[in-house]
Swiss-Prot record:
Protein name, as recorded: Tryptophan--tRNA ligase
Record key words, sorted: Aminoacyl-tRNA synthetase, ATP-binding, Cytoplasm, Ligase, Nucleotide-binding, Protein biosynthesis
Family affiliation: Belongs to the class-I aminoacyl-tRNA synthetase family.
Any one GO BP annotation for this protein: tryptophanyl-tRNA aminoacylation
Broad class of where this protein is predominantly found: cytoplasm
Subunit structure: Homodimer.
Subcellular location: Cytoplasm
E.C. no: 6.1.1.2
Short motif ('HIGH' region): ranges: 22-31
UniProt organism field: Corynebacterium efficiens (strain DSM 44549 / YS-314 / AJ 12310 / JCM 11189 / NBRC 100395)
Amino acid sequence: MTSQDNDHTAQTPARVLSGIQPTADSYHLGNYLGAVKQWIDLQNSYDAFYFIPDLHAITVDQNPEELRARTVSGAAQLLALGIDPERSTLFVQSHIPAHAELSWVLTCLTGFGEASRMTQFKDKSTKQGAERTSAGLFTYPMLMAADILLYRPQLVPVGEDQRQHLELTRTLAERFNNRFGTVFEVPEGFIPEGASKIYDLQNPTAKMSKSGENPKGLINLLDDPKVSSKRIKSAVTDNDGVIAFDVANKPGVSNLLVIQSALTGESVDKLVAGYEGKGYGALKTDTADALEAFTTPLRAKYDEYMSDRAELERVLAIGAERAGEIATKVLAEVYDKIGFLAPRSR
């Protein structure tokens, strides 16, 4: 039996891992429908590891108190959305020192040119300017690789913007295994079934993002329902008044249909058929109602979790304990393979 077999055998489910940054006061609708909604389903069939990557968050300036508060809030939101600590391992990245330690090893295995070709770094550094871009942003992909490889997941759900980073992760895993001996699982990336790409309400050809140019294009899950309803009803559509699903020619209308479909479970085709002879006002009202029906109980659950900080921290401590046991063991194998002298007790 190899070292990898200790974590995964034919009798145990495959492991899946993903994370979401604590860089805003609320996760947005795109975060949920494009990722977290699928995490909730995956925890029923996989050995699921989900984490809050606060180390990644500090690649840009953060207010310390805000970061701490957002980390707690992020955990509460994930639990309120349906991440079950009995079926998933939920933890905070910085609670596991092995993430930063393995990141350094992987950084030393990464060529400068290889790292320089990462599209996300090039785009962000061009936008921010060299003087305002941290070296942490440059090494972000190697930290992401460490996040993944520490837990030997077979599957990693990723969006299109992270595919290049996952390919680097796979390359580094193979490079290490070939050079020093097999330690790492080489993970497969996948887009989970049912994942919905949600677009900006004011610019429906751009992905919904907290960094969007117009805040009215964003739906935050914890926003007052009246605010969210107003944003849905002011969403950009078009002038022909026909409700049809056509991403190329009717991106705004198509986006609203996808949102409503994902929230209600009705197929887009069935929704379109039901709007025959109706205008955009009906589509927007129904989508706003579906959103409110989803976020109202969510906010209540979130408030309940936030009212018991000690219980939240207990859940994260249990997750960190389990994650730490695995990560520490894998890091020890890495250190042994590369020739580090192991510490000994006196």
